[in-house]
Structure formats: structure tokens, C-alpha cells
Amino acid sequence: MGPAALACRTHPAERSRQLATKKDSPATPRPSGGAGVHPADRHDLIRVEGARVNNLQDVTVDIPKRRLTVFTGVSGSGKTSLVFGTIAAESQRLINETYSSFVQGFMPSMARPDVDRLDGLTTAILVDQERMGANVRSTVGTVTDTNALLRILFSRLGQPHIGPPNAFSFNVASVRGAGAITVEKAGGKKVEKRTFERAGGMCTRCEGTGNVTDFDLNELYDASLSLNDGALRIPGYSMDGWYGRIFRGCGYFDPDKPIAKFTKRELDDLLHRDATKIKVEGINLTYQGLIPQIQKSFLSKDVEAMQPHVRAFVERVITFTACPDCDGTRLNERARSSRIDGVNIADACAMQISDLAEWLRGIEDPSVAPLLSGLQHTLDSFVQIGLGYLSLDRSSGSLSGGESQRTKMIRHLGSSLTDVTYVFDEPTIGMHPHDIARMNDLLLQLRDKGNTVLVVEHKPEVIEIADHVVDLGPGAGSEGGQVTYQGPVAGLAASDTVTGRHLGDKAAVKATTRDRTGVLEVRGATTNNLTGVDVDIPLGVLVVVTGVAGSGKSSLIHGSVSNRDGVVAVDQSPIKGSRRSNPATYTGLLEPVRKAFAKANGVKAALFSANSEGACATCNGAGVVYTDLAILAGVSTPCEDCEGRRFQAEVLDYRLGGLNIAEVLDLAVSDAVGFFAEGEARIPAAHKIAERLNDVGLGYLRLGQALTTLSGGERQRLKLATHLGGPGEVIVLDEPTTGLHLANVEHLLEMLDKLVDGGRSVIVIEHHQAVMAHADWIIDLGPGAGHDGGQIVFEGTPADLVAAATTLTGKHLAAYTA
């Protein structure tokens, strides 16, 4: 075989090394090491030995560098713990240690993962599913630096010329000043008048947020009560805490006087007073009126990123309307007056990104050629990655987890870095099968530049392009954490692992469908890109809403259905959970259990809470003691007094059904179902919640397991189980297969059938073909994304969709069920 043939069979990531080798002179002595191999070329593996993070059971695995490795396994098997919690975490920790101790003091401290040995690590770049931008000022344009490039472009080419790039920024306010200064010249002093002006683009009325707010004072407080009697209805504003001490000590009003009897001055001080220094109980504090305080503490965050109870308060009390001065563009009139070819910067940011890219191609000016090239590359990357339907003024907090992850990828697509480890967490989340091929091309591009690409993924389409596969299992939680297979994809398909058995799964289109019991009428829907959509959504059946990303699925369902009475919506927003939160506290299961313990033992229920009176005094109910080591990573050690059980010793003497409260919290969900079903420990309310957790496939979780240890898929199903207990007759689910293994999807379908057979209507927004094939009715939106979508392109049964095969969804479903 000739050299040309050998080159054709060489992996792309190895070609750069071969080129470098060819440049070596024959006279150049090679370092000792035998076999003519350069010592530096021996480090071709990332070696993990004895990993024990979360549920990993002394995992040892070798991962090839400069290859695409996909990590598979059922949800909760330990994939994220190995890739993110071990490999990526240690890489980032080692990089942080290269900075000076002064710089490290400003960086988050990271503990070393529980692993015996890690070799061959390179710089890790994490691209995860975390949503972006809790700040109300954060947009798609700001997080990708595209806005900055646009501002420079308009400052150079915009007519009329209004100033530097800051003049087009909605985060910079215009400032003007004047005064006299003393200037010393030639030994003499002279007073001169000087003025200065900083041009900013911020709209002064909405302060660059694009919205103005109107407060419903009746929802803010009960005017018939005094402050001391609990008039305030604001989350966290308790008179028992610091707010109460400030209100009582400020002297601006009488806290025992009903608010309805306040004078105009007192009411203004309560609601609108500017920040004022006061002294309360000998402590210097700042008093501020309720409305500016709420704007500062609540409205500085994006509504989508708020905790549920805070979000409910904001939606109840505050009405958001587009700013009348800037029409929601965030920019002042001066910034909007400068134009390029009739387009101002607000118009450009409001364009669909694919349209903006085309508009920029029409601008030809040698003076800004490098700027246009960089801007064009970024916008083309959006289109290439399947996000061309977004606009730069879209709030980053409104992006789904999948959209956020792909937006983060934009920064890396044009990077010239090589020998970097890229780590992705299910990059195909929220992607239609039609878009997955483009994502695969991007992953291969990163690999072919000589990078190591590690991907946690469930989709067969991504697994099939892998150079190497690591499968974890065999089960989830304590039943997982082991490497069940590692090697090429062909070997995985032939292996007897859960993933191997399901890799080639094909779904059969449902032969018989249920009959509808009624319809939900939607008429003239125009949310976002919807074009006056009229549709009747069947009730009493399983309805699946499909379409490419950006086609209008969420706009139709969340904009026209989710807010109706009797509808319970489970969206993709992440659940909030600290290291003290666990499935028992999050679902409300612990409350009836505490009451049952109290009743059985004749004591207070507060004793059976690790966050209240029953908490171990040494660790405050955390189960571990945290030691702060300043710039070094903090250390957590099991509490010696309670031995990690979180409760006082005397509390553990009280029993119910033969178990104390710590032992109950250590039960697996599947065991808890039986424990709460009969005997002394029979607690119907707790039994019902445990059953729901078991039904969504979380039977392996422990009731007291910290939420911070759960994977993304586990958290999604935990949230789903909580909402399933609601009173709604119609349940809306937004991509419930997120984070689910192929085997777990079967359990999800069984649960959906159980809901429908129980008399509920289920509407699912989904891309997974197995869910589509199982539907009673499909509503397909498209034909494309953004302004190319927003129309109903098909309504009917899965069999009819496959038979017609005229839409993108129909073609992919036909291929999946063939």
C-alpha cells in the first residue's frame, strides 16, 4: 500500500503530528525511548483510576485523546459524575492552581475529585445545559459579544455619526457635566470653564431593560393591617427578621399603625423613599422604599430564572409593559437615529439572525472588512448550529437548556485552539432529528482539529459517529457506577448491556388510537413567530406537538394553552436545590412523615427536621462539617457527632415502623413505597408521593439524597413527579425525554398511558421519535424555523404522518419506524 493510501486512512487528528514529523531532519537525534517513538507521543490517553465521585464504584477507564468519545448508560448510571465531576473538574482545578494566590482568592474553590489517579489531562472547556443569564440585561447578543461588534460597526458607518460604540449600548447611560477648574500655566493660575459629555445609548425611562413596571399595591400589602400585624405580602419580608427591625427603627412611620391610616408622606416613605443611611440598634443600615427595593432585589433578575414562589409573586404584583419611550428596544432616540442603509442598530438586533447575516453580506467597506468578517463568522455559526431563528435582542434567560448549550458552542467553533478537551452534556437536547446531523458535523469538526471531544449522550444518531464509547451501568444510582463496556460502537451494539440492547431500537406506529372526548380551541395565535394559527387540540388522548427547533411549538402551547384553568404545565426550567434539599423535602413527602413520627412518639414534629429543632448541633443538620481553607478548596468531612445522619442522638431514639427518621430518609424510593403502605408506618400521603416517584423511574433514589447529586434527567423526572400530583385535567410536558436513556423512554410512555387512561389529557412537546410513534394525535409545526415556521403543516395520527411523509418530521418518523 502506497503512502497516499496510508494518508487516506489516517485519522484527521493525527495528520498534524505526521506533518510535524516529516519536518524532522534525518540527522536530528531522537530522544531515547525505543521504537523511534518520541516520548511526548506516548501521552495519547486520559487515564482514570479508582474514581468514586457520587455513585462511581472505583471506576478505571482509558479514554483516547484527539478522538470523539461518547459516554452512555441509563439515567443516573454515573456518566455525568465521571465526565464532569471527575475529568473536567480536576482539569479545571489544576488550571486554577496555576494562578497566583491573590487571583485564586477571587475564584471559586474546587475540591479534588475522589479518585486515585488521573493522568493525561488537558485543558477542559465545559459546554453544559445550564441556562444562561439570570440578569434582565443579558441577551443573545451580549452573551456572544455580537452586540459589541455591531456597536463598533454602527459607530464607524452609521449616519449620522453620533459617537463611539458606547453611544449604541443600552447598558451605558448618557452623562453630561460642567464646572470650573484651576489651570496652572507659565507660573500663573487661571480658572477655566470645562464641560464633558459621555454618550450612552440607554433609554432613560426603562434604564435599558425595555420594560416599565406597574405595581398592584393591593397585592403588595394588606392596607387594613399594620406592618407588625403582617401587612406585607412580599416573599422574605418578615417582621421577625432584619426588615422588621429596619421598619421599626427607621422612624418614618408607626409600624403599629394600619397602612390605610398612613399620611401621604408616610406612605411615600414606605413605598418610594430613596436609599437613606439610618442607624438601627446601633448598627449603620440603609433604608429604601419597598418599590425601589423590589426593583433592585427581584427585577434585576430575569423572571424565568426566579424561584417558583418569587416568580408567582412578581407575576401577581407587577405588570410589565413595553417602554413607550423606546418601544422595547432599550435604546434612546439618539442611538436609534443612526442608520446603515436605512437600518438602525435596534432593527438589526430584532432581525432573525439568518436575515441579519444576509443583510451584512450587502455591506462592503474596506475600512471595516476585518470587523465584518468576524461578525459574519459568528452569525453564520448561529445558522450552522441551528439557531438562525433567534434574534440578538432575545433575552438569554428565555433560552431553553439546549439553546443555551448551543449558544455557548458559538465561541468555540472558530477557535484555533488544539489539544483541548471539549466536554458536552447532551448537546442534542431540544433538537429535531433533522438538526442532529448538523450537530454531529460540528462535533467532528472540533475533533478533526486535534481536540479531545467527550460527549454525554443518549441519542443513537450521536453514538453512531463516536470513535470510542464508554457505557456505564448496569443500573442507576447504587446499582450503577460501573463501566459495562468500552470500545468501538460496533462492539457496543453486540454487547449485552442495556444500551447495546436498545441501540438499534425501532418503534412501531400505534395501530389503534384513542377517541377524543373534546377539544381545546386555539384561534388566531400570534405569539412570537406564529402566523394566526387556528387549531383544535384533542382532549382525553395523548397529543404530541412536533416540529424543528424554532418552529413555534412552545409558542403555541405555552402561549395559548398552559395559562388556561385546569392546565398543569411542566416546562424545562431547572429545579432549585441546595445540598440540604432532597427528594423528600422537594416533593413534600417529608411533611406527613414528620407528623406521623410526632404523633407516634408524642413529641413536636419540628424535631424530625434536619433544618429545625432536630438538627445535629455540630453540623447544623448538614451531616458534614465544612472547613474553609482560604484560597485552597474547602474540605468536607462527615460529622463525628451524628456520623452523617444529620439529627441529634435523642431524636434518633424515636421510631416509626421500627425505623428512626434517619433510616427512613435512607430508604430507596422503591422500598419506601412498601414501607408507607401498611402497618404502623402506613402514611397514605407519603405512599402516594413515593409511588409517583417510582412511576417516573426514580425508584433507586434515596429519600434523603441531596438534590445536588442528581443528574439533569433525574431532576427533570423529580419535577415531573411533583407536578403529576396536581389537580390539572390537562397536563403539558415540555420534552420529558430530556436526559432519558432509550430504556427509560419505555417507562415514560407507560406513565403517559397511565395518565391518559386515568382520564387526563396529555400534551407533549417532543422530538423523540418513539414518543411520536406512541401518540394518539400529532400536531406538526413548520415547515422551518423562525419566520419560515409558525404554521400547522400536519394534523393527524402517527400512521397518517408516516404515510404522507411530506414534512421533515414525517420523513424522519417514517425512517425510524421502517
Located regions from the model:
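P-loop/Walker A nucleotide phosphate-binding surfaces of NTP-dependent enzymes
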Residues: 8, 14-398, 404-423, 442, ...
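Helix N-cap at the start of a conserved alpha-helix in ABC-type nucleotide-binding domains
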Residues: 432-437, 741-746
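Conserved beta-strand-loop-alpha-helix hinge in the C-terminal portion
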Residues: 468-504, 581, 586, 780-812
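C-terminal boundary and immediately downstream tail of ABC-type ATPase nucleotide-binding domains
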Residues: 152-156, 492-514, 595-599, 802-818
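Conserved catalytic segment of ABC-fold P-loop ATPases
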Residues: 452, 464-471, 754, 761, ...
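H-loop/switch region of ABC-family ATPase nucleotide-binding domains
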Residues: 456-458, 765-767
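Walker B catalytic acidic pair
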Residues: 425-427, 734-736
